A protein has these predicted regions:
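Generic secretory/membrane-interface signal
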Residues: 12-16, 33, 88, 92
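Short, flexible coil/linker segments at or flanking structured domains
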Residues: 7, 19, 29, 55, ...
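Generic detection of intrinsically disordered/low-complexity segments and helix-coil linkers/edges
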Residues: 8, 35-38, 60, 95
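Glycine-rich phosphate/pyrophosphate-binding beta-alpha loops
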Residues: 20-36, 95
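Conserved metal-phosphate-binding beta-hairpin within the catalytic cores
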Residues: 1-27, 66-79
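Peripheral (often C-terminal) accessory segments that flank ATP-dependent C-N-forming ligase machineries
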Residues: 45-131
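C-terminal, non-catalytic macromolecule-binding modules
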Residues: 36-47
Length: 131
């Protein structure tokens, strides 16, 4: 920045013009589907074939969180503990392809949660490291 901008930064700070804060690949559409209990592919097909959305909004909306883990870290909670504690919330759990490891970790957990507080707690639990 050449001049200070409130809420953005001070003179000399670098500011990302575009910051990609989503998982790579098809996970974004999965997360949208889970968070809104919908099917974005069907909505897209409706737009192409009928020029409008035909799939009704079921009105069920929540948060969908992605939490990744790396094999080289020691975590406070085991894979089994995560699955047990969040059994009713986890919608996807898988080992990622090696090409995604540097950006997204080796193991991913995706969960559908009621609100931001529960979402933050899920991410903290999954990613908490041993001290």
């Amino acid at each position: 920045l050449t001049e200070a901008k409130a809420g953005l930064g001070a003179v000399g700070d670098y500011v990302g013009l575009e910051v990609n804060m989503r998982p790579a690949g098809g996970y974004t559409t999965d997360m949208t589907n889970f968070a809104h209990s919908t099917d974005v592919y069907e909505i897209w097909a409706d737009m192409i074939t009928a020029n409008r959305r035909l799939l009704p909004d079921c009105g069920v909306h929540c948060c969908c969180a992605y939490a990744g883990r790396r094999d080289f870290h020691r975590y406070a909670h085991t894979h089994e503990e995560i699955l047990s504690r969040y059994a009713d919330s986890i919608v996807m759990c898988e080992r990622l392809p090696e090409v995604m490891w540097p950006q997204m970790g080796n193991q991913m957990y995706m969960a559908k949660l009621r609100d931001q507080e529960k979402t933050d707690a899920f991410i903290r639990f999954v990613q908490e490291r041993m001290k």
